[in-house]
């Protein structure tokens, strides 16, 4: 008796769950026929405005292009192999528009970059225990790593 009740209740749930025709994809059901016709008319209008590629080019141009496709490819320009030698313009940096690097120039550049990194706001933080906001709270309340009471 209980299996009959379960079967009947399951069938009732199915009947009330799917009252009409079932569709495989309900997204397409939300598009009306009028919308589809408007879309089709829009596509037809667009096709009328844009000429086909074959109509845009005269037949003579198309035949010339077909002949070029059938022709063998032109060989690339010959580039001499690299011998491993550097010419003076490349050695002096003339090819890149820069002069040679001196040791003093390099050290001055590195020192200026190091100063810029040390002067950055993150480097100026006095405490590594808390973030910036916690440092301000810690300084006023006496909490934190850098709390000094006077």
UniProtKB/Swiss-Prot annotation:
GO terms for biological process: cGMP biosynthetic process; cGMP-mediated signaling; female pregnancy; negative regulation of systemic arterial blood pressure; neuropeptide signaling pathway; receptor guanylyl cyclase signaling pathway; regulation of blood pressure; vasodilation. GO terms for cellular component: cell projection; cytoplasm; extracellular space; perikaryon. The record marks 122-123, 129-130 as: Cleavage. The keyword Disulfide bond applies. The modification Phosphoserine is found at residue 128. The precursor molecule is proteolytically cleaved by CORIN at Arg-122 to produce the atrial natriuretic peptide. Undergoes further proteolytic cleavage by unknown proteases to give rise to long-acting natriuretic peptide, vessel dilator and kaliuretic peptide. Additional processing gives rise to the auriculin and atriopeptin peptides. In the kidneys, alternative processing by an unknown protease results in the peptide urodilatin. Disulfide bonds join 129-145. Residues 77-100 are annotated as: Disordered. This is Natriuretic peptides A.
